[in-house]
Amino acid sequence: MLPAQEAAKLYHTNYVRNSRAIGVLWAIFTICFAIINVVCFIQPYWIGDGVDTPQAGYFGLFHYCIGNGFSRELTCRGSFTDFSTLPSGAFKAASFFIGLSMMLIIACIVCFTLFFFCNTATVYKICAWMQLTFAACLVLGCMIFPDGWDSDEAKRMCGEKTDKYTLGACSVRWAYILAIIGILDALILSFLAVVLGNRQDSLMAEELKAENKVLLSQYSLE
């Protein structure tokens, strides 16, 4: 085999190995991110009490707990299965979009099984669109959630100065921050999926070209 052909074969082998390694990392990060998204959706620590709040407590997307001022016990309400218990329409909308994003990222993980049956590049691109839609749902959920801060229950915990997009004496908690960071993560994952899909397309084109060269050389020898 000529040195140029050996170098080309070595480059092709490394190219395939690197693409597979990056693909495995992308899949692992997607699974980890799905777990984080489920935690953000379930945990009620999006906003919480502070030093100067009238009542102790915390709010999530669909579950919240507020003290009664006379004891340390918190009264908890809210359920995703019963939207009527949510104190604001904004909380209902935010719960819907964050819940939809959770379902999309889980569906993306289920799509990993398509790698065994379908074209790899196509699966990457399907997952990329799903992750991009997932990021859009996260953006909507995170933007709509503060619109419900003017609800009576939120004001009871955070004070009368609380209003839409004004948190009053309360503070933002870790689940809300994690959801905002998740938007950037989802965009990075979708971009990486597009890159991997395009690399698979170019890889298939190179393999097809190599096969054609082999067939032509065999035909010429005959």
Curated annotation (Swiss-Prot):
Expressing tissues: Brain-specific.
Entry keywords, A to Z: Membrane, Transmembrane, Transmembrane helix
Pfam families linked to this entry: L_HMGIC_fpl
CC per GO annotation: membrane
Chief location: membrane
Subcellular location: Membrane
InterPro entries: LHFPL
PANTHER family: LHFPL TETRASPAN SUBFAMILY MEMBER 3 PROTEIN, LIPOMA HMGIC FUSION PARTNER-LIKE PROTEIN
Similarity annotation: Belongs to the LHFP family.
Name of protein: LHFPL tetraspan subfamily member 3 protein
Species of origin: Mus musculus (Mouse)
Lineage: Eukaryota, Metazoa, Chordata, Craniata, Vertebrata
Gene this chain is encoded by: Lhfpl3
